[in-house]
Amino acid sequence: MTLNPTVLVINCGSSSIKFSVLTADNCEAVISGIADGIGTEKPFLRIDRVTQFQLAKWNYSDALAAIADELDKRGLSKSISLIGHRIAHGGEIFSESVLIDDRVVEEIKKVSPLAPLHNYANLHGVGAARQLFPGIKQVAVFDTGFHQTLKPEAYLYALPYRYFREQGVRRYGFHGTSYRYVVGEAASFLGFDGSDCGLIIAHLGNGASLCAVQDGKSVDTSMGMTPLEGLIMGTRSGDVDYGALAYLARQTGQSLEDLDHMVNKESGLLGISGLSADMRVLENAYHEGHEGARLAINTFVHRLARHIGGHASSLRRFDALIFTGGIGENSSLIRQLTLEHLAVFGIDIDHAKNKRLQHGTSQIITTARSRVTAAVIPTNEEKMIALDAIRLGYAQQGTVVLEAVI
């Protein structure tokens, strides 16, 4: 039996491996899952949110081997023709996706100190996949790549210049794969000329950021050298005065490592609310009058609206605001509160459309008289990674599959 070719997409995190298998002809999802708890005593593998297995071992190689075994049991292993890897940080070396070879692996290692928690995990996944699927072309897709079009005035920190020159300390930005996908979808859905429009895209999830896109290129973004900067997130503080951290260190005796853990794991929505990092939990509590939840959501929205206003100044023209990501796509409350903050831009929300949005669909949520269009457009990072794998992996062969997908 001849199997239709598929693309395996791998995203290795600090303690998990997310994976998807997509058809190579139209990038439809065939199967997806997650190996979680890597590095703990109780790792498990869940497939399609239903089937769950305990894993006997808990490193990346064994977890990926278990994933490969499950794919083989389902008759999918032999269909895999390409593999795409999400890589967190490409530094200044990688501005676009690349086919993986030994040289590329070494270059990724060079920039990995910029994102040690994620890049080394990504590299474990690359190494394991190259062993498990020898001979299959693999592609690295960088979360920072889309933002390599930022100008120096947008990416430099006002620190002594030598730290940028010698250590690479600058703003890089993240969620680039999501932004690339949404930019393409926005042009077709909204009927814009992608080479002549100004967008602000709000990728709102447990990690959250903004990107100002002018004529299809990133010109500003809220995350910085790490994903900590910018918006309030689930457990990350976002922007915080360094002086406040220095004060805490002096007053409490906490170390740099203690403070780093605090701003990344104990802050954000969780820190303010004292209840949860999950926006769904906070929204329920918000409507029930929970003081901490209301404060967390109002502070989240204020920070978001303030950053949107700032990002607008990086555009030549502000045509549309796009909400995406888990919160952006599913929270009518956050969209409503944010747009109400942005009335100064002439944004006029259509409350009925905002509340009636069907899950997984794109929708304009402003009225015809709104000076700036606001819309919800679902992201699909796995599809974007698969498309890059197809574009690069089949390029040398001139395969018709590429033409069918693109």
Swiss-Prot record:
Substrate binds at residue 86. It catalyses: propanoate + ATP = propanoyl phosphate + ADP. Pathway: Amino-acid degradation; L-threonine degradation via propanoate pathway; propanoate from L-threonine: step 4/4. ATP binds at residues 11, 18, 175, 203-207, 278-280, 326-330. GO terms for biological process: acetate metabolic process; L-threonine catabolic process to propionate. One of its GO terms (molecular function) is ATP binding. This is Propionate kinase. It comes from Yersinia enterocolitica serotype O:8 / biotype 1B (strain NCTC 13174 / 8081). The lineage of its organism: Bacteria, Pseudomonadati, Pseudomonadota, Gammaproteobacteria, Enterobacterales. The gene is tdcD.
